[in-house]
């Protein structure tokens, strides 16, 4: 028994997660009625979601309070990459529609408790109001826009106070970081529970019923992750981007795939940035911000399903109109974190461009919920891993420019 325990302790975390995936898959197929196993996954995701807002607040406030005047953070380039990457992902989804046109079988039951936003203005109005949320409420409800805003304000205010107060916030940051390490160490057990729940509740029939739609969604996301993003990285750094790309997908994308939550993956991304030796002053802001606005996967989902609806209803559109859809999808996707239901509930905004009624658009959303088990996992993996990738290549590009 001691030998098994020692072997487990020495095993790499990613290998442990792989073992957890296999065990969860087997249990989901062989013992689907033992629902208690799924609670392990809920506890894991719940723990990450619970600690993440406090971690972000403490780390960002601590970083800002200790930041020296004129210190380089590369945030401008990172934000440009976030927005450009989201737009390019939306554009790739348009091209995928021309190569593999889809149609949908509608009359799908829809969760009527969810209501889509009335337009892009409403999406951004919601985001702006989140900026001025009560700081305690922002922490309690995981409103990361509000958490970031108040952490920046507290950090700036702490610049002018005695060092004892700064030491207090640093202690809080260290304590929350240690708690995150403990939680991540039980990731294999949590992911085993998540895989079990997915398999036992949905089975594998979903793969055959909506195979082509799933293939187009996943294939487009893989193309962005393995071609478009590396191309952006190469243009900026003039170095082989794939070692970094695969590191981000392995260490960030894998956990994000199973947690299906960019917010829950923030602690994982912060740890990865530290392991990569990136500037703390940069990644403590860019990673939580990326979880809010870096939404390439969401833009792909919006465009693929919207254009599938357009094909289904026989609406003819030219490429310029599809290009306009990419802009709308990119802007909408940046607000996906502020909408209940995420990217799927922003599909009616895009459908409205083509005169598709809200009732019909919500049927398209219903199809999205059916494939959501796979779509949401891949979407989150792409979004979250790209947060680290863009942060890293922005810093590499900066130092390359300084040396030149």
From Swiss-Prot:
One Gene Ontology term from the biological process aspect of the record: threonine transport
Role summary: Involved in the import of serine and threonine into the cell, with the concomitant import of sodium (symport system).
Presence of keyword Aminoacyl-tRNA synthetase: no
Compartments (UniProt record): Cell membrane
Coiled coil: none
Membrane topology: Multi-pass membrane protein
Protein name: Serine/threonine transporter SstT
Superkingdom classification of source: Bacteria
Positions of transmembrane segments: 17-37, 39-59, 75-95, 138-158, 179-199, 212-232, 287-307, 319-339, 354-374
Alphabetized UniProt keyword annotations: Amino-acid transport, Cell membrane, Membrane, Symport, Transmembrane, Transmembrane helix, Transport
Main localisation: membrane
HAMAP family with a match to the protein in the record: Ser_Thr_transp_SstT
GO MF entry, a single one: neutral L-amino acid:sodium symporter activity
Gene Ontology cellular-component annotations: plasma membrane
Gene3D superfamilies membership: Sodium:dicarboxylate symporter (1.10.3860.10)
Organism field: Streptococcus equi subsp. equi (strain 4047)
